[in-house]
Amino acid sequence: MALALEISKLQAWYGESHILHDVNFSVAEGEVVTLLGRNGAGRTTTLRAIMGLTGRREGSIKIHGQETVAMPTHRIAHLGVGYCPEERAIFSSLSAEENLMLPPALKPGGMSVDDIYQMFPNLAERRHSQGTRLSGGEQQMLAVARILRTGAKLLLLDEISEGLAPVIVQTLAKMILMLKKQGYTIVMVEQNFRFAAPLADRFYVMEHGQIVEQFAAPELAAKMNVLNELLGV
């Protein structure tokens, strides 16, 4: 199967701080992959490095075979990459629907507003509500929905289940499975292991800015002792 993302010997810095040390992993087209690890392990920095949002990067980041380690962020986005940061970045003075209308089409095949409302009925009900009046769960749905509007097919999702009610987490899990069926490639950073476990095809565990363990979904049960040791799950 063709690779959507191939990372080799990736190093990244914030100023003088050397955060990522020779990170190596790949994601096939249509796969869901989860980066696991404790806070500070380098998972979010990995997503930011893929998008060109860290200060300095070295090594190789290939997206659909194209080298991007020296590309600016806007060009990376135009390769069909969507990034949903942990902070959500909802425009609070705009309505939910106005937020949805903001993203530019980067690639053909982005979801229509009606498609989004079918996937997230809550947003349809709250379409005229200001961003500040949306619940945390509704804001998270909106943040994910915006990148689905762009036509991006490689999605980088940072802690999308964090701090949300179980019913919202369930909605997001259904969304991931639906997107997977539609051929999207997804890289998730997740602290919520119960959320990620049934969704991902493969798992990479990070520690101190490196990949220290990797395994496929069928190996999950056999790896629980290792995960407990590394993550405390």
What does each of the following model-derived ranges do?
Residues 159-160:
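Walker B catalytic motif
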Residues 51:
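Helix-to-loop junction immediately C-terminal to a conserved catalytic motif
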